[in-house]
Amino acid sequence: MTDTQAAAERIAQLRTELDTHNYRYYVLDEPSIPDAEYDRLFRELQALEAEYPQLLTPDSPTQRVSGTPASAFGEVRHEIPMLSLGNAFEEQDLLDFDRRVREGLADLLPGGDLLGGGAEVEYSCEPKLDGLAVSLLYERGQLVRGATRGDGSTGEDITSNVRTIRNVPLKLHGEGWPEILEVRGEVFMSKAGFEALNAKAVETGGKTFANPRNAAAGSLRQLDSKITASRPLEFCAYGFGQVSGTLPDTQVGILEAFRGWGIPISRELRLVKGAQACRDYYDDIGRRRDALAYEIDGVVFKVNRIAFQRELGFRAREPRWAIAHKFPAREELTELLGVEFQVGRTGAVTPVARLKPVQVAGVTVSNATLHNMDEVARLGLRIGDTVVIRRAGDVIPQVMQVVLERRPADAQAIEVPEHCPVCGSAVERTQLVKRSKGKESISEGAIYRCVGRLSCQAQLKQAIIHFVSRRAMDIDGLGDKIVEQLVDRGLVASPADLYTLTYEQVFELEGFAELSTNNLLTAIADSRKPSLARFIFALGIPDVGEETAKLLARSLGSLERIGKALPEVLTYLPDVGAEVAYEIHNFFADEHNRQVIAQLRDAEHGVQLQEEGEVAAEFAACASLAGFIDKLNIPFIAATGAEKLASRFGSLDGIIRADWLDLRQVERLPERAAKSLRDFFDEPANVQRALAIEAQLREFGMHWQSERKAVEGLPLAGQTWVLTGTLEAMSRDVAKDKLEGLGAKVAGSVSAKTHCVVAGPGAGSKLAKANELGVKVLDEDGLLKLFDEHGVAR
């Protein structure tokens, strides 16, 4: 076979593969490979066609914009084709683009020459949104048509759907717009909108989307515009098509005019001069990429002067005056070599993908999270599969999907080990149950756990690492490596063992000398008097983060109350749902955990908890009989029915004793609700449980109120404070804890709603902002005086 024949075969193969991917991407909205893989195939085809120009044909994917309109929508012919942009993947690609532009404008630039010398070119710069390109046609200021790009020449008529996008003006604002104006831009979905859409889909059992781009495309191409209207779509203009009238003579000027007419444009639009300034913009947007509210995959540079754009013109499928500088791919293809199982702090046995190493977003990736076995099942994953992996920012790489057409015949199923890979204990499957706000319990999949607890070194190490962390017991100098040594040498088998370590035991650890040994023992001793909130957080209760730990400590006041609180009682705490309440209750009900806590509180060697006291007034005053009845989750008894029952009978005992005739006298209480209530309390276990909950509420100081009361029991309740600069008497974390203990919310930024800013040495922009807004400012002495006034220990 000759080289030409081999090239012809490869070209035919590439064209078929690219056409297939184009169809899946543009028509079905179901991309089967990452953009980076498509770009590689496309560049390979371009290179072969350049080397063998006799094999170039008009129907090659390199000679047209991808996609064909779906038959379900009417067709729209674009008077001016909607072409795609050329791509730059390396800095040299950008420099080559700038050189070609300057060469093409040699006769128009001051001091220009045929080699691209002379003045620098002005470029407009904006992020490249990852959405769907559309055209909006305005006639006499009225929106008359919306269309997709389609194949660049013919798109789909999506007018009724475009009209539902809230930031698309149906009538242009102001004046001076052309009689006919075609606005081109991107329809996209913000990250927050995408997450909310998927969360809603999960709740209703609907289909979730893989990414915001797919969600935007799928939403925009709905035949029922009511569905589109329910989706959080947005539009951002980046250019224009046909125009009957006049527009400004620069790209930036046109976009600024759009903004004046009510058409949204990018807030990141900038005008720069020269290739280096373009590179600086690219770097700046790249650094801020993860903080942006929407997904982008690069930036777009366009020659700013429209006259220069016309002079440069077009080539086969793209303008010569614009280029998209792509970011390193966040999605790549690789092979799943195997799956290993790791054991976490709570004993959860989770699968981790071992991958054939691949570069993703500039980093070599060989491992990726699989979350849990439900995710493995959802993906339909097998060892040997070709998979799409994604890495964004600091997020752990994830397996996004399986490329089924590349699955090998010998692909192997993934099975959970029967025994813990670390300690050999049994692995048990636990069904997760979500207790919804309604009356039903909903299965949420399963989790696999090692039953070895602290006898499992993996669980023990992670438990100790969490226990000593800065926001928990804050034992300085006890890093991960030291914890591993302590566990591996058998010196620590429980968090309580930290407080019995001797000088000799620590001194013998690798890397320790006299000073470091004394420092560590001092740090351990200094942690013996933690606040109740820190101690609760340090215990590592599943689903209990730092804020929930503070809430528990502030509301219930003592470890004893928290430990014996029934889950139904815990749900009276704000932001504590049923799932978290059951996790807390089950943790303290577990005998093993109770033993560990008892060891930690040993009078001779353990910790002495601070800030233990009474139940908070806000918690004690928040209960109502109607709310209590509603929380019992009796079928057909909703909040309204519960209020009627509370009003009619006045006490739980009265409701329990009510017979059928009594219940029928409750105004507008449905018969099925009355029957359900009677059936519920005919079960002795339900009566016993309800009375136990009421008894504990009363023990904790609650009394039924006809309405919920908000008690302003803390001196700084409702106030927002900000800490900035360096504090000398205490760390900012300690100051934050003390302010929160007084009821304040401690924020990270200053606004007009900020009550006070505490500024230590080195305070910068936050102090300046406070002065600008007229916000009260305290120095450290003022803060300490405040603490003294309210009896807060320094």
Curated annotation (Swiss-Prot):
Q: Which residues form the active site?
A: K128 (n6-amp-lysine intermediate)
InterPro entries membership:
BRCT_dom (IPR001357), BRCT_dom_sf (IPR036420), DisA/LigA_HHH (IPR041663), DNA_ligase (IPR001679), DNA_ligase_AS (IPR018239), DNA_ligase_CS (IPR033136), DNAligase_adenylation (IPR013839), DNAligase_N (IPR013840)
What Enzyme Commission number(s) appear in the record?
6.5.1.2
The entry's cellular-component GO terms read: cytosol
Q: Which SMART domains match?
A: BRCT, LIGANc
Q: Which keywords accompany this UniProt record? A: DNA damage, DNA repair, DNA replication, Ligase, Magnesium, Manganese, Metal-binding, NAD, Zinc
Residues covered by the BRCT domain: 711-794
Q: What class of enzyme is it?
A: ligase
| Function (record text) | DNA ligase that catalyzes the formation of phosphodiester linkages between 5'-phosphoryl and 3'-hydroxyl groups in double-stranded DNA using NAD as a coenzyme and as the energy source for the reaction. It is essential for DNA replication and repair of damaged DNA.
- Which protein family is it in? Belongs to the NAD-dependent DNA ligase family. LigA subfamily.
- What is the name attached to this protein's record? DNA ligase
Species name: Pseudomonas aeruginosa (strain ATCC 15692 / DSM 22644 / CIP 104116 / JCM 14847 / LMG 12228 / 1C / PRS 101 / PAO1)
